[in-house]
Amino acid sequence: MEMTNAQRLILSNQYKMMTMLDPTNAERYRRLQTIIERGYGLQMRELDREFGELTEETCRTIIDIMEMYHALHVSWANLKDTQAIDERRVTFLGFDAATEARYLGYVRFMVNIEGRYTHFDAGTHGFNAQTPMWEKYQRMLNVWHACPRQYHLSANEINQIINA
């Protein structure tokens, strides 16, 4: 992250204020303040991750994934025989915190801040699937988009999507 000395001073002051405003996270803010003030390049890369960016296209794809899971669960609940498909298979897991943290952060933002998909169960891990999911979700989306009635899926269509 490239910053001028003036920008570093401003950010350092912000962290100093946050230390006073949020004592529970004071150590974290003091650490970040030290990194900024001293210009530790390796540790400043952490800020790049914190101040990362998701493109509009990526955000829309994540919403599409969440919408697909909404459709899967609604369709599953409307089946005459729900025993044929385990409910866990149509439950949104989220993304891997280790490799897909930005996607996971966006999911948490959508649910906890925006109030969308609040019926999704965050589980004990807060939508941390603990395994990379992006490619799996892409395959599932391709199958779901090919279905003529995306919100009235048959058991066969549900199985095709979750097994993609």
From Swiss-Prot:
This is UPF0304 protein YfbU. InterPro entries: UPF0304_YfbU, YfbU_alpha-helical_sf, YfbU_helix-hairpin_sf. Signal peptide: none annotated. Belongs to the UPF0304 family.
